[in-house]
Amino acid sequence: LFREETGFPLWEYRRIFAQSNYQTPVTTGDITLMNWPQNDYFLGNVYDVSSQEKEKHLYQAKQLSLSLFYWLQTEAPRPDGGKGYPGLKLRPDVLGTKNGLAKAAYIRESRRIKAEYTIVEQDVSPDFNEAGTGKFYDDRVGIGSYSIDLHPSMAGRTYLDIKALPFHIPLGALIPKDMDNLLAGCKNIGTTHITNGCYR
């Protein structure tokens, strides 16, 4: 959980405020966002289902996040042999909600457009690009750098993290086929399931 412990420091991974960056004492403490594989909810869909089914899954997703948070407060093993970090607390003041959870569920993978160009793994993989960057697009409109990060799925496939090179964002991936006057953005651009893991 933390840098002084073994493993990957999840606390720092999504930290949005580090008290150590300020000379003046700050009483809020560090602030991190809990968007980790441990609170990924994949027991149902919120698209193409009834309103009742959607609300059920959104509720259960909140319960999963609250359960993980409770475990962190009360049972997470500490380096000193103790259990839990009772000083952790939800921050309604930061997120603008009554319960301290996000205002909306994070949908990790949305529907994607059928784009004029679809970015494939070979475009970003070091196995197919020798220049130290991903494929060079003449119509590039942006840049990015993130590994291909796929979380567990409803089919039970486990977490996957594959190295990807720094990459460009081609305009063709933002333009849908067969539709005028629309540009896609974020996780619905022309990617595959694999490359969607790094284009965010």
Question: PLM features: residue spans?
Answer:
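Flavin (FAD/FMN)-binding glycine-rich loop and adjacent Rossmann-like elements that form
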Residues: 1-198
